[in-house]
Each structure stands twice: as structure tokens, then as C-alpha cells.
Amino acid sequence: MIDRIWFGHSRLYLLLLPFSWLYGLITWLIRLSYRSGLRVAWRSPIPIVVVGNLTVGGNGKTPIVIWLVEQLKKRGLQVGVVSRGYSGKSGKYPLILSHHTQPEEAGDEPVVIFQRTGVPVAVAPKRKEAIRALLKKHPLDLLIADDGLQHYALKRDFELVVIDGIRRFGNACLLPAGPMRENITRLHSVDAIIINGGEAQKEEILMQLRPSQAVNLVTGEKKPVEELISVIAMAGIGHPDRFFMMLAQLGVNIIKTQIFSDHQHYTLSTLLPLAKKTQSLCMTEKDAVKCKAFAQPNWWYLPVSADFPFVQSQKLLASIEALCHRIC
């Protein structure tokens, strides 16, 4: 229902507009309090690159964070990542991730980032606490704040916004009448805009998600995803249809799709009935990190990586690297 209101042609959003006006006023007052000096944002001793959204839901931030980390490491920088750790509940914050950290503690996205990159990752409701914890243990040159665009308590040196190139801004209304966390005019003040799929407009950088081979959750075996038989596709992400469309474009024989809520908590009893032993259950990497403890031999996940035009990507990386040299 909410997707039809935000991204369809339903006029039910009109009923929610008064609440959106109130939300807009509150967010404007928060930003104003920092700009006027009534509230003081915390400045990290090393550069902060924020990767965030203007809209609610899965726009593809995690693959971009992973790409940034990998590319900046190749340039010789020591990089760390901080996050709110949404959906995770730890007994103590800040939490620095290790190979034993579970998604239930840190959230699924920080765990994926840590497992894919191996760089220091910390989560805390207050990002400055996560940053301080990392800097006590690691000599870092630069930090990436995952989903921190609206966290104005943290000063940032570079803002990167990710937009779903297919759905873009929906009806362009603020929450709850629409998907917007902030007004579209916020784009005028950011440093880079990345479009996930679709067609890039002026000043936007086009990103494509490139799938690799499917990975078995139990054995680690890899094979082309189109070789999986009788596939039941499931996704608990912000935009599950993107995952299903990717599988279809790869020629996967999809028998059924199953959508779960974003950041869904999974159990064996929930997933076991979805696919028979003669079928393949295929999921996203973000879902997979929450299912490995009870995975079955016919469960697979499909990792994806961000891919950018060479010239634009090098310009983006050079801008971020220059920040570090200037501040450090």
C-alpha cells in the first residue's frame, strides 16, 4: 500500500500531507539549529565522507560504500566505516565489529561491509562515539559514514547521495506522504550524486550493480546463478523488485518470489517451507548474513558490486583523496 502511495498514482498521499508539513518543519528546525550555532556539530580529527539517501528504502548505498573502501585502499589510504547499525541491538555501544559479530548486534549492512572489505567498522547511535572507538584502535586516514546524511550532529567533509534511478523520488513528498527524508533542493548542497540504474541526468554519476556468481551458504561453492534449478527468490531489502528483475535478466528460472520487510529477522521455521530440497532458495547477500547459522544445502545468495564509468569514478576518488591530503 505504501509503495502505491509513494511511487504510484494514488491520491491517498493528500491525507498525509499535514503530517509531512510537520515533519518538514521539524527537520528544517534541526538543520537551522546547527547552522545558527544553537547546536554544535562534532568535528572528527580525520575526514568524513557521508554516503546517504534523500529517500527511505534501499537505493544501493552498501555496494557503494564497499566500492569506495576498496578503491581508496588501492590508493594507499587506511579507511574505516561507521554506521548507526539500524536493526541491530548490542548490549554495549560503540560496537567494533569482529568476525564473531552477528547481524542481530550490529545490523545486517555493517556486517556485510565488514565481511566484504575487512576494514575496521563500528556502530553506535551517536556516530562520534563509533569514530572515537575506531580511532583509539586503528590509525585511519579517512572514515565513511554509512547512511549519515541526516545525522547533522556530525560534521562532514564530503557528502555523497545515492538515488534509485528507476523510482527516483516518487511523488517527491516528505514523509509520511512520500518517501523523502529531506526536500529535493538538498541536492544543491551535496558534493556528488550517484544514480543506481536508469539514466543519469546532468551532474549525476551512473552506477550499475554487477552480479557475480551465486554462493552456497553452507559450502561456499560458487556457480553461475542461471545454473540454479527451480529457483525460489526471496528478498528482505528496501527495493526487492530490483533483485528479482536482476535474476530474471540473468536468465534465472524463477518459480516464485517472496518479499520480506527490510531488515527482516529470519528463522529456520520461516524460510524452510519456502523451497523444497529439489529447489534452490536464492537471496541477497544482506539476507544471507542473517541466515548462515541455520542455512540449508540448497540455499544460495548473489553478491553484487558497484560499477562506474572510469572517468567519473576517478574524478570522484581524486576529490575524496584530496580531502585527506588537505586535512591530514
UniProtKB/Swiss-Prot annotation:
It is an enzyme of class 2 (transferase). ATP binds at residues 55-62. InterPro entries: LpxK, P-loop_NTPase. Its EC number is 2.7.1.130. Pathway: Glycolipid biosynthesis; lipid IV(A) biosynthesis; lipid IV(A) from (3R)-3-hydroxytetradecanoyl-[acyl-carrier-protein] and UDP-N-acetyl-alpha-D-glucosamine: step 6/6. The keyword Thylakoid does not apply. GO terms for cellular component: plasma membrane. GO terms for molecular function: ATP binding; tetraacyldisaccharide 4'-kinase activity. Pfam families: LpxK. It comes from the Bacteria. It catalyses: a lipid A disaccharide + ATP = a lipid IVA + ADP + H(+). Keywords: ATP-binding, Kinase, Lipid A biosynthesis, Lipid biosynthesis, Lipid metabolism, Nucleotide-binding, Transferase. HAMAP family: LpxK (MF_00409). Belongs to the LpxK family. NCBIfam families: lpxK. This is Tetraacyldisaccharide 4'-kinase. It comes from Hamiltonella defensa subsp. Acyrthosiphon pisum (strain 5AT). The gene is lpxK.
